[in-house]
Amino acid sequence: MEYVVMIIILLALFFIFTVFLNTRYSFDEKCLVLKFGLSKTEIPINQIVSIKESDKYGVADNIDYKIGMPYAQPDRIVIETTNKRFLVFLNGAQQFIQKYKRVSV
C-alpha cells in the first residue's frame, strides 16, 4: 500500500513539473504558440521582427511579457514583434531558433 501511495505522489509531481514548469512551443503555418502553465500565447509569425538569445536572468530592457520560469530553464530568448517584446525562458534555444528559421522562410 505504501508503494502505491509513493507512486501516485511521484506521478503527480511529474505531471506538475511537465505541465506547469516547462515552457512548450509549437509552430504552425501562421503562429508561434508558447505555453507555460495554464497560459497560452500566440504570436503571428508575420509580426515577428527578430528572435535572439539573451543572457538576462529575468530582467531585460523594454520587455512587455515574460513567459516561463527564469530559474528552472537555462535558455533565454527575446522575441521582438512589431509592437511587443517577449522574454521567453525555455530549454533548447538553438533548436527553437532553427525551427523558427525553417518556418519563417
From Swiss-Prot:
It comes from Bacillus subtilis (strain 168). Is essential and sufficient to confer resistance to the bacteriocin sublancin 168. One of its GO terms (cellular component) is plasma membrane. This is Sublancin immunity protein SunI. Its main location: membrane. The keyword Transmembrane applies. The chain crosses the membrane at residues 1-21. Keywords: Cell membrane, Membrane, Transmembrane, Transmembrane helix. It is a single-pass membrane protein.
